[in-house]
């Protein structure tokens, strides 16, 4: 295993994840039961390794430039059921069991509004009380 690649097993063939020039890949989190897309974030090799070791979703924050465990502050965690790679191995999919809302705005999914700004889902928690 190299610093810029993390491998995973699929059908007994190792898949080498193709991290971009910043050392990241997009990671889509999807509810394993409902199929709802919850969020898109970025993953570094370390975040992917930690996710595989712990069974809890870890990501890399581009704004804070640090590794973070989903739910570390809010308690709204993502338990990993399966990790998949796309056909080009440059995007990954976390199939998760979501505890609480996935979005820091209080919604179940980060995709809670249309392009014209209409909110199509209700909040599942109050972010002001969670992120005091």
Curated annotation (Swiss-Prot):
GO terms for cellular component: cytoplasm. It catalyses: 1-(5-phospho-beta-D-ribosyl)-5'-AMP + H2O = 1-(5-phospho-beta-D-ribosyl)-5-[(5-phospho-beta-D-ribosylamino)methylideneamino]imidazole-4-carboxamide. InterPro entries: PRA-CH (IPR026660), PRib_AMP_CycHydrolase_dom (IPR002496), PRib_AMP_CycHydrolase_sf (IPR038019). The keyword Repeat does not apply. It comes from the Archaea. Its EC number is 3.5.4.19. It is found in: Cytoplasm. It is an enzyme of class 3 (hydrolase). Its cofactor is Mg(2+); Zn(2+). Pathway: Amino-acid biosynthesis; L-histidine biosynthesis; L-histidine from 5-phospho-alpha-D-ribose 1-diphosphate: step 3/9. Binds 1 Mg(2+) ion per subunit. Binds 1 zinc ion per subunit. GO terms for biological process: L-histidine biosynthetic process. GO terms for molecular function: magnesium ion binding; phosphoribosyl-AMP cyclohydrolase activity; zinc ion binding. Mg(2+) binds at residues 86, 88, 90. Zn(2+) binds at residues 87, 103, 110. Pfam families: PRA-CH. The keyword Hydrolase applies. Catalyzes the hydrolysis of the adenine ring of phosphoribosyl-AMP. Belongs to the PRA-CH family. Homodimer. This is Phosphoribosyl-AMP cyclohydrolase. It comes from Haloquadratum walsbyi (strain DSM 16790 / HBSQ001).
